[in-house]
């Protein structure tokens, strides 16, 4: 092949790649729209079929959030070295001390083996929360282990596991989602009682992170679930999983009911809510900690990791179109 032919072939291949790559990047967007539409068809009567239960082959501590990229899981977790202690009376606006610990982001294969582990946070900021993947980065909030505190928001390259601090914020941010359509980041506070929105510039840094939290927050009008893990699902919506705990008396053992909320990011109101009537043998509700949902051939496949330390990845599927 002469030089001219090689140059022509190179040009053609380059043009084909430029056409294919955007299509590949956009392929996930219809999937998340399909997922959101199918979630809205779930109900209390939905039957979830167990697919597998995969033991996680290392100490997971207290898992918080999960994303699945291909056949790899990424799970945020807090290693509690010294539990927090409540004050008899609030001290400087806090109801407890900081405790001590280490924040982790684990990279795990589908057989439950640890591929990589990075630590996130600094000092008293060691509690990672719910996480989201935007097609390029995993967004991870790390906060003090108490309400009304402080947070550092990171984004992590899933290939290299390199973390980049994006900003700091004067409240406990317990979960984030990245709205890739209007270039904004959304956060939920301790117990998901408050919502935050940060506009992002071209570099992914917020343009309003220095604003007082009181100016940015909106109150969550739904009190059914405390959100643990949220994901962006297109059209300015997030899919949040979480739990509510109920006690017959203050000293009684809690009954834990898990569920899913499809929430509008425009006003923070739930568009759809449903319980998820699944529990592990330990009694822990499946949506208590990390959750990943995806559209499947049958309908929806859910990945759950509700238990601490010696965790199991529970995979369920339900038929819904």
Summary of predicted features, one role per range:
Residues 70-71, 135-136, 181-183, 235-237, ...:
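Short coil/turn segments that connect the beta-strands within blades of beta-propeller domains
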Residues 51-94, 127-130:
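Beta-strand-rich domains and repeat architectures in extracellular enzymes and scaffolds
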Residues 76-100, 143-147, 242-257, 312-320:
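Short, conserved, GDST-rich strand-edge loop motifs in beta-rich repeat architectures
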Residues 49-56, 113-121, 162-167, 210-220, ...:
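A short beta-strand motif characteristic of beta-propeller blades
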Residues 108-113, 156-161, 200-204, 265-268:
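Short loop/turn segments that connect beta-strands within beta-propeller blades
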Residues 33-59:
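A short helix->beta-strand "capping" segment at the edge of beta-propeller domains
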Residues 222-271:
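Loop/turn-rich, solvent-exposed surfaces of beta-rich toroidal or solenoidal domains
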Residues 61-65, 123-130, 170-180, 222-231, ...:
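Repeated scaffold domains used in trafficking and secretory/extracellular systems
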